[in-house]
Amino acid sequence: MKTAIFTVVLALAVFAVLSFGWEANEKALSEEFTELIHEKEAASETEARECRYFWGECHDHMPCCDWLVCRYKWLITYNICVWNRTFPEK
């Protein structure tokens, strides 16, 4: 009887150690994934755009892309880039 109880307690201790190890590994993987996402976001933010895209706010110092034109829309308080009914050449 004592051997059976000792075996059960020992098995529970082993399972507790294994689950703690898996949890620590999962947290480390989650942290690595979060760091990777932040690095990708930082890299994309540092890229300078040459022109403003569709529905983007535009001014003289922020030109629209070639297939867009800067127009004032009465529902919006600033100028936006809208389609000029042409297609960009590829």
UniProtKB/Swiss-Prot annotation:
One Pfam family this sequence matches: Toxin_12
Main subcellular location: secreted
Disulphide bridges, residue numbers: 51-65, 58-70, 64-81
Record bears the keyword Secreted: yes
Organism domain of life: Eukaryota
GO cellular component: extracellular region
Tissues in which the UniProt entry reports expression: Expressed by the venom gland.
Prodomain residues: 20-50
UniProt-annotated location(s): Secreted
Keywords for the protein's UniProt record, in alphabetical order: Disulfide bond, Ion channel impairing toxin, Knottin, Secreted, Signal, Toxin
Endpoints of the signal sequence: 1-19
Function: Ion channel inhibitor.
Protein name, UniProt field: U7-theraphotoxin-Hhn1j
Species classification: Eukaryota, Metazoa, Ecdysozoa, Arthropoda, Chelicerata
